[in-house]
Amino acid sequence: MRKDPSVHHFQNKMIGLFLGDTDFSEIVLKKIKKQKIKYFIIDFSKKNKFKRDNHSFRISIGKFGTIIDLIKQKKCKKVLFAGKIAKPNFSSLRLDFKGIYYMPSVISAAKIGDAAIIKSIIKILNNEGIKVISSIFFNPELSLKKGNYSKLKPNKQDISSINKGKIYFNKTKSLDHIQALVVKGDKILAKEGKEGTRKMLSKLKKNSDGILIKLPKKKQDLRIDLPTIGLQTFVDIKKYGLRGVVLLSKKNIFLDKTECIKFANKNKIFINII
């Protein structure tokens, strides 16, 4: 069996994991454990879901000094972010000296959105000589390559809708919240807000006959913020009568792949990676 290049890269090295909520963080951790890579966790989940792991640390986002000291103490040069890291309650945060120094930049980023908070943390880590790698570095199998993965393929009108979506994403700013659109022909039926894809889909009329397009924005930081779909997305696609889903090749996180493809084929939904 061919050895995974990520294992070779991290032989006798330590990876730092900033883990938040959603199944994705657990999938990343499971793979790292399976490959016997040395790791430690900084648990940013709401309910401290990694507390049973002996290598897990619960540190407030305001204690940058403690976080950076831990990373350096572990002789760690590289970290990754996985899962949803929610905006903290800044008024109740306890800060250390580095927290006081760096917190203004995090607070101003928080006004823009969750992705901006992580971007500001990456900047801080960078200042301290710590490199952030892609969230799917150890899980390349979660990202699909170009191709059609369902029995149903996009028709001419669908291709026109896809092109409309591509033009829109090329114009959006890197910190806008929009990572998903529903398009039908030349018309954009829905745009994703801060609340995410599910909330956007819930505002659609039944049998809307559009296409869900999830593409990264221009200048988006693909180490931390890849468009993600899973089985729940397909359940919602069926519920609102959408024709299919479109993602960008190798710039996506596709969870529950086998179940999703099975569900898509059963319900005549296309999966197109462009």
For each feature predicted by the language model, list its residue ranges.
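Conserved mixed alpha/beta catalytic, RNA-binding, or beta-rich assembly cores of soluble enzyme
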Residues: T22-F24, I32, K111-A115, N127-K238, ...
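Intrinsic-disorder-associated, low-complexity terminal segments enriched in Asp/Asn/His/Tyr and depleted
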Residues: D4, H8-H9
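N-terminal basic/disordered segments at the start of proteins
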Residues: I15-F44
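N-terminal glycine-rich phosphate/adenylate-binding segment common to multiple enzyme folds
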Residues: I67-F137
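Feature captures the catalytic cores and cofactor-binding loops of soluble hydro-lyases/lyases
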Residues: I27, F44-D69, Q73-C76, D96-Y102, ...
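Catalytic domains of riboflavin
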Residues: F18, K47, I121-I124, E128-I130, ...
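General beta-strand structural signal in soluble alpha/beta enzymes
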Residues: L17-L19, F40-I42, V79-A82, V132-F137, ...
